[in-house]
Amino acid sequence: MNPTRHAQHCDDLTEALAAFRSSCSVLHRWGGELAGRLGGGARLLVAGNGGSAAQAQHLTAELVGRYREDRPPFSALALHADTSSTTAIANDYGVQEVFARQTCAHGRPGDVLMLLSTSGASANLLSAAAEARRIGMTVWALTGPAPNPLEAACDEALCVAAPASATVQELHLVAVHMLCEAFDQVCEERASVSRRPSPSPSPVAVERGAL
C-alpha cells in the first residue's frame, strides 16, 4: 500500500479549498439576497443530477428546516425530489425537459433558481436556466471548472477549480453551508431589528402635539 497515493484525495481537496476561499464574498452576498427574497415571499428552486441532486436537496432541507438555530421555515423546492413529476416529464417530453417544465410550473418573477453541476454542461439544467430567465427569475449556479455552458447561461456562477468531480461536489457542500450561514445571519439581523421597541415620543413632541 502507498500511503501517499491514498492521501491524494485529501491533498486535492486541500489545494482546491485554498482557491475556493476567494468565493466567500459571493456566497455571503447570495445568502443575504436570498434571505431578503424568501423573506418577502419569493421561493428558491434547486436542481441537479446524481450527486448534485443530493446537494440540491441538502440545501432545501436546511432552508425549510433549519441550519443551526431555530427560525421560521422558508420556501425551497428541490425539483428532482418529486419523482412522479420527474419521471412523467422524462417519459412524455424527454429528460432534457424534467427541470425546465417544473421551473415553468413553480417559478415566478423574482424567484431564484439554483443549479448544481460538476460539469456545467448538463442539458436539462441548461434548459431550466433558459426557462427561468424567460420567466424573470434570477439564476445562480454552482459548477466545476470554468468556462462551461452553465456558467454562461446563468446570471452568476461560482465555479470550483478542481479536476475531480468528487472534489467539486465536496466544495459544493461547503458552499451550501456557507450560503445557509449567511442566510441565517441576515434573518437574525432582521429579526433583531423587528424585536426592538419603538422609541417613545419625547415630552416636547407630546406637548407640541397637544397644542
What are these language model-derived features?
Residues 207-208:
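A cross-taxon signal for low-complexity, glycine/charged-rich
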Residues 52, 57-189, 193:
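Glycine-rich phosphate-binding loops that contact phosphosugars or nucleotide phosphates
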Residues 44-45, 139:
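Hydrophobic beta-strand scaffold residues
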Residues 199-201:
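Compositionally biased, low-complexity intrinsically disordered regions
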Residues 19-40:
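A short, well-structured juxtamembrane/interface segment
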Residues 1-22:
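Generic N-terminal amphipathic, Lys/Arg-enriched alpha-helix
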Residues 6, 27-30, 56:
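Hydrophobic packing residues in well-ordered alpha-helices of helical domains and bundles
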